[in-house]
């Protein structure tokens, strides 16, 4: 099956609805992907890229239904990775002498994958062109390390289509091909996820390369990517986003992620987030447990954030393995213009938080003070965590924060509980597992416990909203039990 892109250009690629892992297991393709190949039929017939190797036979079979393979005059390989050039071996078994146009580095990559040095390679560099008849040309632009050394883009004159390789793409599968046809929220989420997890390390190269391409003063009516949609409506919108993302991008957002053995570090994360929100209710705060969250979503949020707090329990004097792995990935992604702080709980001996702080600093983050707790944090320790969050909010604020935005402290809230006790509602009760506090003056509306309900009148089937345990794990709040 083919889809008309424009005039004599057709999409002859492959949709992959089922793929969930890309680059090994490093990128979760939660919405599938597509491998975009394009057939140009002008005075010369040109094939731009192929598809992933696992679809080789299907690709060649579908291509044969579109064109006699012997009629293909040129093959353009913009990128030698297997999801782009994977079907070459199958295709070349039918047309072994067809010229392949690619960069010098691509020959090494193609031979490394396919082991056919006898193929008819023709190397190109930036500014080279290929006449394809009917007054049209293909112009080549090398884009090394966006994101492989062999990468290039191909521009078609006349139709003003830029075949952009991996740039401006998304791992996003849809039966509809064009950007104006698909769900816009999904599309831009996947664009940002793709940039954050794949292209961020090369941000320093993105702006000068885009500037170089724009310097050719060539009109761009469409951008035909290697994955995801073809940009036909306002195609330069994605170019503008790339320029924005490449410029040390950050939003007014803070990301916390952690791993925990006994929920102690989770309690710290929750309290830190509360403190941040007390001081700066306008900042977006996102919390992730790495054991239960999509790694690429975490990294996308780090990319969007002005700062990140990373938490870990101590195990064998070092950080938890999932945290160590994620910090290693952040090191490779080379995030810039971001701050960081480490936190975590330990038992008889620590070590993980200091190690984590060093690793975050080595990864290029501007470090703030770290925070440690021993064993399960009690009321006082959780207040220290909230205070840490308040300080982080002030230090990381993008603009001065008004004093009026500060909420009551935990001590003030405890005073409110004491006032409730004097009003004959009885004491506040604290969950001994997660430290959540039941205040009789407030009740718990989500479980139909009305404000003003003393603990003795709370139904026996009441569950702690934080840890879902019953009334038997609650004790009188420590400040009232003294």
Curated annotation (Swiss-Prot):
One of its GO terms (molecular function) is nitric oxide reductase activity. Its cofactor is Fe cation; FMN. InterPro entries: Anaer_NO_rdtase_flvorubredoxin, Flavodoxin/NO_synth, Flavoprotein-like_sf, Metallo-B-lactamas, ODP_dom, RibonucZ/Hydroxyglut_hydro, Rubredoxin-like_dom, Rubredoxin-O_OxRdtase. Pfam families: Flavodoxin_1, ODP, Rubredoxin. Residues 426-477 form the Rubredoxin-like domain. It is found in: Cytoplasm. HAMAP family: NorV. Keywords: Cytoplasm, Electron transport, Flavoprotein, FMN, Iron, Metal-binding, Oxidoreductase, Transport. Residues 254-393 form the Flavodoxin-like domain. In the N-terminal section; belongs to the zinc metallo-hydrolase group 3 family. Binds 3 Fe cations per monomer. Binds 1 FMN per monomer. Homotetramer. Pathway: Nitrogen metabolism; nitric oxide reduction. It comes from the Bacteria. The keyword Transcription regulation does not apply. Fe cation 3 binds at residues 431, 434, 464, 467. Residues 30-210 are annotated as: Zinc metallo-hydrolase. FMN binds at residues 260-264, 342-369. This is Anaerobic nitric oxide reductase flavorubredoxin. Fe cation 2 binds at residues 83, 166, 227. GO terms for cellular component: cytoplasm. Anaerobic nitric oxide reductase; uses NADH to detoxify nitric oxide (NO), protecting several 4Fe-4S NO-sensitive enzymes. Has at least 2 reductase partners, only one of which (NorW, flavorubredoxin reductase) has been identified. NO probably binds to the di-iron center; electrons enter from the NorW at rubredoxin and are transferred sequentially to the FMN center and the di-iron center. Also able to function as an aerobic oxygen reductase. Fe cation 1 binds at residues 79, 81, 147, 166.
